[in-house]
């Protein structure tokens, strides 16, 4: 027989001594917004200042040719065209017309949640490559004319130079995450640059000796100066545009210094030395100097 108090104890609710684990909330991850690497105020001002310096240099180069006969203005014309093209390029970049963005995927690593990714978009000034594709062949042409390099080697040097610049453009605008593509174009461009050195430096140093010691020394100085500067361009690209180790403003400042040295400074050096050395003159009569005004005239009284 069960005592009534035992029945009451049996009917009372009992509390469990074991506790169940309640899972906590899952950590949330806020997606990282797209990161834009663009030029700042320093880079913008640098582009405008360089544009003004290129325009000023173009005007001075044109004035230097004022008293030079048309038949002997070849170096003046080429040098002026180089800085004119550079002026247009820097105006386009300063106004934001010759620029685009190249995006790459960056991964963010987390401890307790899956990794996430976000886009890193870097500003690329493609107008710079248009400038180089037009002006560097003209610079090579000046060096080859000064040294007396034959047309075949001059053409090969110019073609290799254009390939080098285009490879740099393809690498800069290629798919950001495709490392093989980017550095593949970069490697091809570097090999093309070796061909430029081969045709200009080696063949130029051989042919310029026939023009005398003064011209030989001038060519050697200009060629070493130009090729050292051009060697710096792919190095800077690999650090800035390729590996993205510098900001856009720093990239602009470095390229600006190189462009000013490779174009206005090189041009002043060449033209002032050219004026002091008559043996560097290249006389171009005929169509270059007089056009077609004297062509096709009928001379009466002369035998055929």
Swiss-Prot record:
Single GO term (MF): photoreceptor activity
Post-translational modification comment from the UniProt entry: Binds all-trans retinal via a protonated Schiff base linkage.
Keyword Lipid metabolism: no
Record SUPFAM superfamilies: Family A G protein-coupled receptor-like
Localization terms from the record: Membrane
One Gene Ontology cellular component: membrane
Superkingdom, taxonomy of origin: Eukaryota
Annotated positions of the N6-(retinylidene)lysine modification: 263
Segments on the Cytoplasmic face: 273-304
Family classification: Belongs to the archaeal/bacterial/fungal opsin family.
Protein name as annotated: Opsin-1
Gene assigned in the entry: nop-1
